[in-house]
A protein has these predicted regions:
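A short, hydrophobic beta-strand element within the central beta-sheet of small alpha/beta folds
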Residues: 79-86, 90-103
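Receiver (REC) domain switch-region micro-motif
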Residues: 56-58, 84
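C-terminal output/effector regions of signal-responsive regulators
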Residues: 140-221
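The C-terminal output helix
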Residues: 120-154
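Short, flexible/disordered intra-domain loops and linkers
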Residues: 64-76
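Conserved acidic segment of CheY-like receiver
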Residues: 2-26
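Short, electropositive alpha-helical surface patch
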Residues: 105-126
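Acidic, metal-coordinating helix/loop segments flanking the phosphotransfer/catalytic sites
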Residues: 35-55, 63
């Protein structure tokens, strides 16, 4: 299965660095896509969806240089990471920066922040696991989480249709449904109060919605 990695930077030279870096690593089925940041964060997130990206690598200070773009960017890489993960829980995102302290503080996660030198194919430090391999590992982990949730959800739906589900099963079904919806786009998530399984019509709606989410996810995998 291919890995589509979207790289976002306002400077063409770093876009080229990333393309060269991925090419040099020569890992099978990795496709690098480079984009300039959109002026608004919502437009940028739409690009992520349109490109069917499996992971996003973004510069931290997206509005710092105006050599290749002439418009203003009203967000930084940490803002983009937070917005993506609000919509897709656990989605693989990484920030590259020359300003480690600021990026770590704003992202609130030291594990997603890397020095920009990691994508320079001529200066990358020798590491047991390369930056690109770490990205792929996170994509695999995210996909496995979704796959496992899909399988468990289908099992619970079948169990509930046979009237064999316990209260704990019903609660877990709702939890899994939330996870799958958020993995596609949390803006489409059903409010928790609607998901109270107090009658058969609500259960039927939940099952229908779960099937739609699984189908939607399969079309973008």
């Amino acid at each position: 299965m291919a890995y589509r990695i979207l790289f976002i930077d306002e400077q063409k030279k770093y876009q080229n660095n990333f393309l060269d870096y991925v090419e040099q690593k020569n890992i099978e089925d990795v496709e690098a896509i480079v984009k300039y940041p959109e002026s608004s964060i919502d437009d940028m997130i739409n690009v992520v969806y349109e490109e069917l990206a499996d992971a996003v690598v973004t510069d931290f200070r997206l509005n710092e240089y105006k050599t290749d773009i002439k418009y203003n960017i009203d967000y930084d890489g940490a803002d983009l990471l937070h917005s993506l993960r609000e919509r897709r829980k656990g989605f693989p995102c990484f920030i590259l920066t020359s300003y480690d302290g600021d990026a770590v503080e704003e992202s609130q996660d030291v594990n997603v922040v890397y020095d920009k030198s990691v994508i320079n194919p001529y200066t990358e430090k020798s590491e047991r696991v390369s930056f690109l391999e770490k990205i792929i590992k996170q994509i695999d982990h995210y996909r496995k989480t979704i796959d496992n949730a899909e399988k468990e959800l289908c099992d619970l739906i079948e169990k509930r249709s046979k009237e064999e589900a316990s209260l704990e099963d019903e609660e877990r079904l709702i939890e899994l449904d939330n996870l799958l919806e958020s993995s596609v786009d949390r803006r489409g998530e059903i409010p928790a109060e609607f998901k109270k399984l107090s009658n058969q019509s609500r259960l039927s709606e939940l099952i229908k919605k779960a099937d739609e989410i699984i189908s939607k996810y399969e079309t973008i995998s």
